[in-house]
Amino acid sequence: MTSQDAPAWLAERPEIETIFACICDLNGVMRGKRVPIEQLDKITSGALRMPLSLLSMDIWGEDIEDNELVFDTGDADGLCDFTGRPLSPVDWTSRPAAFAQLWMREEDGRPFMGDPRRALAAVVDRYKALGLTPVVATELEFYIVDPSAAVPQPPCSPVTGKRLDSDGALSLDELQHFDAFLNEVYDACAAQAIPADAAISENGAGQFEINLLHVADPLEAADDAVLFKRLVRGIARKHGFAATFMAKPYGDRAGSGMHVHFSLND
């Protein structure tokens, strides 16, 4: 999507009043600003600013001690460029919104290489220079948990009302019990052009895996993965759950992983 296409996209969706302008940090967490749609041009023209340091925070969103991007520069801003990924609807918030994906550049126009998306783009350029095309897909595992508990515990089934208490790998019952949640995940993936494929229940109670299809663009595959994680968490909250992609939320149950399938075509 170009900056010229974005206003037409919003005009077709008059219910949208807010845009989440976001950048992916080094931990795969989306960070950014809530911006009124009147500032769309600022987002798509590369005029929006955010601190360069936001890309190197820890997983809790705090500055790393002695981070030169904070103290040595006075926490200087960088400029945020529109990546060109189409604006996408966010329907799990209290009001409909849109999502815009950005990446950072320096004041002089150079890509900011502390941005993981910029770093990946540089690697992809090296493959292209060799006449090679990476083809990439991801598989993401996550748990649905009960957010009301002080410590993670499996959720109650929306069908039976009983808490899940056993592991159920490839359980059709577990898929069907969480059918409303999974249906909305797939709808959101379609709306955000994320190529969601098969879903299975995994080895842990309330654990699922959803595969994303192969694409011949590592940047697109990485974008798909981080946006997928965000929408799963958002839709889980809408349904009264919490979702976690944490590697080991339970000490006595199977952990969650992310599998990356990677091929090179010449």
PLM region descriptions:
Residues 1-198, 220:
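ATP/Mg2+-dependent ligation/transfer catalytic cores
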Residues 138-141, 198-201, 242-250:
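A short glycine-rich, hydrophobically flanked beta-strand micro-motif that places a catalytic Asp/Glu
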Residues 167-168, 213-215:
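A short, mixed-charge helix-start or loop-turn motif at secondary-structure junctions
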Residues 196-211:
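A short mid-domain helix/strand-loop element embedded in enzyme catalytic domains
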Residues 95-97, 137, 203-205, 255-259:
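Short, solvent-exposed loop/turn segments at the edges of secondary structure
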